[in-house]
Each structure stands twice: as structure tokens, then as C-alpha cells.
Regions:
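Active-site phosphate-binding/coordination module
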Residues: 1-84
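Hydrophobic/aromatic beta-strand patches that form the interior of the parallel beta-sheet core
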Residues: 2, 26, 174-176, 193, ...
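Hydrophobic packing residues within well-ordered alpha-helices of enzyme cores
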Residues: 12-16, 124, 128, 186, ...
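Short, well-ordered alpha-helix to beta-strand connector turns
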Residues: 22, 109-110, 189, 206
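Residue-level signal for inorganic ion chemistry
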Residues: 29, 112, 186, 207
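Conserved acidic, metal-coordinating active-site core of Asp-based
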Residues: 56, 63-176, 180-185, 197
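Asp-based, Mg2+/Mn2+-dependent phosphohydrolase catalytic module
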Residues: 188, 192, 196-220
């Protein structure tokens, strides 16, 4: 069983605490692949790309917030912001406040994320998305988030790596998803389920539909 999420490793482990040592992990939207004890693969983002994204958010998206991810830590500028508190207190992230995100410059940035409390995709559409869609893989993750991965790196590419690592064929793989960043994974797995409360594009990408999360559709 593989946990595959946009979340940080520490957050995924907390969610699956009773069986955390029995799982494999795809974290941060496919940029990191792990066993419970070691990293198998990391995909990093060019510094000029994530710094350019950060500068654009500062200059053109004043209503939005952002953070960067490394394999084991997140970095954001305002520890009192709604985004920071949500990541730290609700998702259980290891996240550090820094004065200037661009000046922070950790060596292994794997993902840049834009946040807006209700309409991130719409806020990014006029300027941010056209500017970066050919330099990174951009995907909406709910109404609050736009995740920006290194170009060509997704949940599906991470899962493909694990299939090769374990000797498992795509037709032997079953995936579940609910957001746009799950679509490639849903389209390519031998069997796939979208929860019924997901967006129409996501439901169309899956081979089957399962009940919504509030009915524990995946567990059913």
C-alpha cells in the first residue's frame, strides 16, 4: 500500500500512525518517494524557477500566500498567517518561518505552493499560471492550493518509479483520487476510483466512482 499525497512526509505518517511502518510513501505531490526509513527518490526544482514564482506572488498576488517545500521541512514568511497556522496546526507540518523566502535558499527545494483561502486557481489564472505553466507542473489541489512541481514530476511519475522498484505492472495497480493532481494517476492505473464529490474532470479521468469521503468511500 502506498500513501500518495501532496502532503509532507511527517503529516502523512501522523495520518496513518497505526500502520505507518507498513506503508510506502509518495509525498509532496510526487517529488519524494520513501520507505518508512529512507528516501528512494527526490526531484528538485530549479532555483530560478521557484524564486521567480515567489517574486511574482509578492508583486502580483497580494491576496495570496506561498511556501516552499524541501523533503523534510517547509518554509514560509509569516508564522501568524492563516496558511502557516493551517499547515502547522491542522496538517501537522514541520514548517519554519523565515523573514525572506527568496533569501532563505535551501538547496533542495522540491515544490512551490500558492495559497488562497477560497479561490487560488482563479487568482493564479490571469498572470501566474500563464507565466509558469511551461516551466513547472502546475496543479490545483482543492480550492485553496496551486502546487508547482518540477517539470515532468507528478504523483504518477512517482508511482511509476515505485512500480519499477517493486516489479508491479500498471494493470496490477489500483489508485484513488479526488483532485486535479490525481488525474494522471487515475488515467494510467489498471483500476482507479474517483470519489463522487470530486470535480467532473477528476471523475472523468477515473475508471470507477466511489462514495464521497464523508461516507468513507475509499474504505468501502
Amino acid at each position: 500500500v502506498v500513501v500518495c499525497s501532496g502532503r509532507q512526509f511527517v503529516s502523512e505518517k501522523k495520518l496513518f500512525s497505526p500502520i505507518r511502518d507498513e506503508l510506502l510513501y509518495i509525498t509532496d505531490g510526487g517529488t519524494v518517494v520513501r520507505t518508512p526509513n529512507k528516501i528512494l527518490q527526490v526531484s528538485t526544482m530549479p532555483e530560478e524557477v521557484w524564486k521567480g514564482m515567489c517574486q511574482m506572488v509578492h508583486e502580483h498576488l497580494p491576496d495570496c500566500d506561498s511556501y516552499i517545500s524541501t523533503p523534510d521541512m517547509g518554509y514560509a514568511e509569516n508564522e501568524n498567517s492563516q496558511m502557516f497556522r493551517w499547515l502547522r496546526n491542522s496538517y501537522g507540518y514541520d514548517i519554519c518561518a523565515v523573514k525572506d523566502l527568496i533569501a532563505c535558499s535551501p538547496a533542495d527545494v522540491i515544490k512551490f505552493t500558492v495559497y488562497h483561502p477560497s479561490a487560488c486557481e482563479e487568482k493564479c489564472a490571469p498572470v501566474f499560471t500563464p507565466a509558469w505553466k511551461d516551466q513547472a507542473l502546475l496543479a490545483s489541489s482543492g480550492r485553496e492550493w496551486i502546487d508547482c512541481n518540477p517539470l515532468g514530476v507528478s504523483k504518477w511519475t512517482a508511482l511509476s518509479y515505485l512500480q519499477n522498484y517493486l516489479g508491479v505492472l500498471p494493470e496490477e495497480t489500483c489508485t484513488f483520487g479526488d483532485n486535479l493532481n490525481d488525474m494522471e494517476m487515475l488515467e494510467n492505473a489498471g483500476l482507479s476510483f474517483a470519489v463522487s464529490n470530486s470535480r467532473e474532470e477528476v471523475r472523468n479521468a477515473a475508471k470507477e466512482i466511489c462514495p464521497p469521503y464523508w461516507e468513507n468511500g475509499v474504505l468501502q
